[in-house]
Amino acid sequence: MSAIITSKFRLDTTEKFVDSLASNTFYMGLGRSNSWPDDTTPDDPYENDYTINTLWENMFAMKKCESVDIIYSSPRTLWTSGVTYSDYDDRDVNIEGKNYFVVSDNNNVFMCLKSGGVSTTNPDIAGVTTSGVIDHASTDGYIWKYMYTIPVDTGSKFLTASFIPVQYLTSAPDPGSDTALLNQWSVQDNAIDGAIYAIKIVSGGTGYTSAPTVTVSGNGTSATATATVTGGVITDIDMTGVGANYTKAVITVTGGGGSGASLRPVIGPSGGFGKDPRNDLRSHYVTI
């Protein structure tokens, strides 16, 4: 019987490890006084007896790790013009291996909800938008969701060339807190559970002479969309209302003089995008 280790399982395991620092004592060992062949890229660690023995032999100091010395993290992808980014897809079995979220030069983190090919418009242009989406459909076709900004203190301690720190706020920050924390709390508070931010075109159909009617049916409410037809084929779907509380939905296409179109919804995670960025960004890594 086949089985998989799910992202949720990995995140739960990571959470248990992070929480364990409050009641257990961990130390980080420091060693190897001689340089690596390339100091910016040390050798990959391996889990075998030889490596473990070598680590102990080279160790010359240990640092106690407190609960404030560890944070969830996700791979760092800096937004760069001319790059094609993947959009979030609730049915993509390889989503964790794709660049579906980015960090800007200002340490703002954005998730891609709709890809438009080569990205040319920096999502950072819109700045901090704690509700709704950043719609660049008229420029490069992308739609982004602002997730959070890495606080200055957090970034100076945990931001690396390969990973970004990710945190979930369990309570509202004090009014005088870092603006980044206040903005993140606003994003978490404004998250819409079960919203449909995108509809995928499985087949564009044929013979459409006008835009057909797109209907969203499911266990949620208020999701609406319109279709764009080019050359008799449905080529784009625009969400005019993302709705709420969907866990399942079916998209039907009627009218327009054509046939054969097939569409499917992309439903957001439990709680909505931004409610818990650790879940959205698959943060089953830690930075110490």
Whereabouts are the PLM-identified features?
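Conserved, function-critical positions that sit in or immediately flank catalytic
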Residues: 140-288
